[in-house]
Each structure stands twice: as C-alpha cells, then as structure tokens.
Amino acid sequence: STAGKVIKCKAAVLWEANKPFSLEEVEVAPPKAHEVRIKIVATGICRSDDHVVTGALAMPFPVILGHEAAGVVESVGEKVTLLKPGDAVIPLFVPQCGECRSCLSTKGNLCIKNDLSSSPTGLMADGTTRFTCKGKAIHHFIGTSTFTEYTVVHETAAAKIDSAAPLEKVCLIGCGFSTGYGAVLQTAKVEPGSTCAVFGLGGVGLSVVMGCKAAGASRIIAIDINKDKFAKAKELGATECVNPKDFKKPIHEVLTEMTGKGVDYSFEVIGRIETMTEALASCHYNYGVSVIVGVPPAAQKISFDPMLIFSGRTWKGSVFGGWKSKDAVPKLVADYMKKKFVLDPLITHTLPFTKINEGFDLLRTGKSIRTVLVL
C-alpha cells in the first residue's frame, strides 16, 4: 500500500508564466489531518488555467495547475470521516467548510476557505505544500492542482460522487459545466419565457446556453467572434447567433434593437472588462440582470456610466455557478446519470495527459471546447 508514504508520480509543472508545461516526476506527500490524497483519472483544460500561464491570473510559481477533474481517493489523513480510500470524488476549487458565514447562509457559496483571492497563497491550510520537484517546493492551485497523477486536497474540497459515473465526462462538473449552468439556475434564476444573451461560447458559455434552455428561456442569443462556435450553440439551445464583427455599432445596441428594450438576462462568459460593460448595457434598462461569469483579468478596473445601474439594472457575479459545492456536485452527477443534461457535446477532444501542451494549443487557437486529459 502507498498510504502514509510519499508517492512519486508524473505531473505537469508550470515553472514560470508564458512557458509550456514541463512533464516532471514529482513527490506527493501523504495527506495530513483533514486531507485526502486523490489519484486523478481525468482532468479538463479550462481557460482559467491558461489565464495563469499568460499572467492574466496572478499565481505563485512554480505551480501545478488544473482544477476541473475527477478521481479516486488513494488515502486519507487522520480525522477524515466523510471520505475513504476507493471513493470516487471530484475536487472542489470552491470548498464547503460548512462553518463560515457564506456556507451557513442560504444565499452564499463562496466558502471562506477558498484560495481564489487576488493574492492567492498556493499552499495548503497549514501554509505548506504537498508537492516537491527537484528539491523545490511546488505550489498548489486554488486548493485542487489536478494536472498530476496524484494530488492532495482538504476534505472540505472534495465531493464524493456515484462510483458508476464516467469520470472522463463528469470531471466537467468540477468547473466548466456547473459554473455556466448554475449561473443561470442559481445566480440569475432565469424565468420561463425570458430573453437571454450569452457572451462567449466556450465550455462555460455553452453550459450557460444549456442552463437558459433548461430554465425555459424563449430567446437565447449566443454571441462570439468565432462563428465556428455557432453550430454547437444552436445544437444546445441557442435560438440566434450573433458575431459582433458583422456590425459597425457596439453589440449592446445590436441586442437592444433585436429585442426592443434589451434582454432580460445577460451573461458575460469571457472575462474581459469591455464585454462586461457591454453585457450590462445590453440588458433591459430597468429590470435587466447581468451576470459576470468569466474570471476578471488581474489588476484591471472597470469604468462605466452609473446611470446603467441607477435606472434599475442588477449586476451580479457568480463563482462556481452559485452552487454550494460539496452539496451540489454529487446531485449534479446524479442528474447527469439520470440524463437530465448532456456533457458529451462540450468535450471535443480527449488526449493522454502527456499531450497537455497540445491540449492548451487547441484551446488558444479556438479549435476545442473542452479537452479532457486522461491519466
């Protein structure tokens, strides 16, 4: 048995920004109290991982990225009660401690134990790391770090799921799908018959489209500058697709003309401040709701006309789709098993873990929606 011992395994280490991932042998320490060590089976490539590579999201280096995954518990530290070796799990970049004000509130989901701040530590709760490589300490990423054969997470940052679930599919419930789907159902609470606009048609944006359809929206306007994304958006429920490049005027004016007075709900699923204000301006001046789903770039500030808000609009943010992670993830997996939603259309590529750099190239060139790496 490997329990209680250091495991040597393969991991993709990012030594510095704007460099390819380096496949290295790393040492993964055993889990401490309240921690679990997980054998990662499948992990998705999300734009937020790439934001660290480009420097748009500030993280301490060197680091093992990856946060959208599924795996099996290899061993548990002392005092762990809810998980045991052999359990199928999804790591949670938004943990659920069950004790902080966000966890205790019916309205909240962003647990205080998260490492998503503008100055992340990249460390476990005790201020240390479980990864070393070539004698150097390697940082964790938002409490998950899934671009490795083995990782260690806090027990509040792993959800036990149905062991029959296909891990190479449900790994998307660890981020992309849940983030988009929940932004509609949990954060915006879209009503039947509504008109919605979705800015950005990557994996998360398409999950927003699916959420709008599930909520009964009558018009779902999908917006992207890459027209190759439109067929998939329509397949998943978009009623119209708009390419801002086809117009001389700002996209919020186009949407206002298309809908009369603006959409009921808009979703920014890109992470650009320009599209955040466009999305806000495109919703109804008095009762429109706009939700920021894309991770905002580090150190950039928004300036906008406050009259956009004064007239009655609501501007909201949504992290992990507003779901209380440990409670919701097992239910979302169960819903997937009951065929209440699909994940296959989001997964355009499945690659062996060693081809991680190729997977990121597919993302950057707009050729993929989700690439799943199989370990």
Curated annotation (Swiss-Prot):
Binds 2 Zn(2+) ions per subunit. It is found in: Cytoplasm. Transmembrane segments: none annotated. Its cofactor is Zn(2+). Zn(2+) 2 binds at residues 97, 100, 103, 111. GO terms for cellular component: cytosol. Its main location: cytoplasm. NAD(+) binds at residues 200-205, 224, 229, 293-295, 370. Its EC number is 1.1.1.1. It catalyses: a primary alcohol + NAD(+) = an aldehyde + NADH + H(+); a secondary alcohol + NAD(+) = a ketone + NADH + H(+). Pfam families: ADH_N, ADH_zinc_N. GO terms for biological process: retinoic acid metabolic process; retinol metabolic process. It comes from the Eukaryota. Zn(2+) 1 binds at residues 46, 67, 175. Keywords: Acetylation, Cytoplasm, Metal-binding, NAD, Oxidoreductase, Zinc. SMART domains: PKS_ER. CDD domains: alcohol_DH_class_I_II_IV. One of its GO terms (molecular function) is all-trans-retinol dehydrogenase (NAD+) activity. The modification N-acetylserine is found at residue 1. PROSITE patterns: ADH_ZINC. Belongs to the zinc-containing alcohol dehydrogenase family. Class-I subfamily. Homodimer. This is Alcohol dehydrogenase 1. It comes from Coturnix japonica. The gene is ADH1.
